[in-house]
């Protein structure tokens, strides 16, 4: 589960870079939303992994 959160977090960062540099201006808002969603998912799964052991 943590692996998927990291993968999607990296994808959101790459999409954000393309969106913020003007390469895909329409995707900037989507990238911002995805970035925050996957940041939350990453932190939650990280905390679950730490407290589970």
Curated annotation (Swiss-Prot):
Coiled-coil ranges from the UniProt annotation: none
Chief localisation class: membrane
Disulfide bonds: none
Top-level division of the source organism's lineage: Bacteria
Localization annotation: Cell membrane
Transmembrane annotation, as ranges: 5-25, 30-50
GO cellular component, one term: plasma membrane
Entry keywords, A to Z: Cell membrane, Membrane, Transmembrane, Transmembrane helix
Membrane topology: Multi-pass membrane protein
HAMAP family hit by this protein: UPF0391
NCBIfam families in alphabetical order: PRK13682.1-1, PRK13682.1-4
Family from the record: Belongs to the UPF0391 family.
The name this protein goes by in its record: UPF0391 membrane protein Bxeno_A2958
Classification lineage: Bacteria, Pseudomonadati, Pseudomonadota, Betaproteobacteria, Burkholderiales
């Amino acid at each position: 589960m943590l692996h998927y959160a990291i993968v999607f977090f990296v994808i959101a960062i790459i999409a954000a870079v393309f969106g913020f540099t003007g390469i895909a201006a329409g995707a900037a808002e989507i990238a911002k939303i995805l970035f925050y969603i996957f940041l939350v998912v990453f932190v939650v799964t990280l905390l679950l992994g730490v407290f589970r052991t």
